[in-house]
């Protein structure tokens, strides 16, 4: 299954309404160079394990992200690889087993990247940068977000633990609302 290897990079929800900006403890500008790598992991406890959503930039055959009509309209060969925002939803059971639930892909475009940057800026998420320190020490955080820019700079946003405080809940809600909206506007889903 494709899901287990993505855990090393360290998941389905209805589209949510727009969220209010997160109160800032400090401000930081959003990097203005192209995003080279994006990896986000969200973990939510359920009765017999953990529901996980992994969202990342990934190159996939265009047929995985676009309908046959869209491929024809754009003149793209379905086997041609394109960069997409990919989502992998799965469950890790308490006994260590994994179950893949769904995959979603939507093309990563300049407009989508600009929209992502606007969300980061609107919620002052660059100020949440912990420079990877939490990811080094927190086991199974509720969320772990890594954005690497072509400039060589990166943004690391990791929750302080498996349970979210009010501020961390607002961070997660802002990002997942953007993700849900991105997938609601196009792309394909594989159950």
Give residue ranges: language-model regions.
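Boundary at the C-terminal end of the N-terminal hydrophobic targeting segment
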Residues: 10-15
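A short-motif feature that recognizes glycine-rich, charge-decorated loops
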Residues: 87-127
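N-terminal glycine/threonine-rich, aromatic-flanked beta-hairpin/loop signature
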Residues: 66-94
């Amino acid at each position: 299954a494709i899901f287990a290897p993505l855990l090393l990079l360290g998941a389905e929800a209805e589209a949510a309404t727009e969220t209010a900006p997160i109160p800032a403890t400090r401000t930081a500008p959003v990097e203005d160079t192209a995003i080279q790598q994006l990896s986000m992991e969200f973990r939510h406890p359920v009765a017999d394990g953990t529901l996980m959503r992994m969202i990342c930039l990934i190159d996939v055959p265009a047929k995985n992200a676009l309908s046959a009509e869209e491929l024809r309209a754009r003149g793209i060969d379905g086997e041609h690889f394109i960069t997409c925002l990919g989502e992998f939803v799965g469950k890790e059971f308490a006994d260590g087993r994994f179950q893949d639930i769904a995959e979603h892909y939507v093309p990563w475009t300049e407009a989508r990247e600009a929209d992502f940057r606007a969300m980061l800026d609107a919620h002052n998420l660059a100020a949440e940068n912990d420079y990877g320190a939490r990811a080094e020490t927190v086991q199974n955080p509720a969320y772990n977000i890594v954005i690497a820019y072509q400039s060589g700079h990166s943004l690391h946003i990791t929750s302080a633990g498996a349970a979210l405080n009010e501020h961390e809940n607002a961070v997660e809600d802002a990002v997942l609302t953007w993700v849900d909206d991105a997938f609601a506007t196009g792309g394909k889903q594989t159950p």
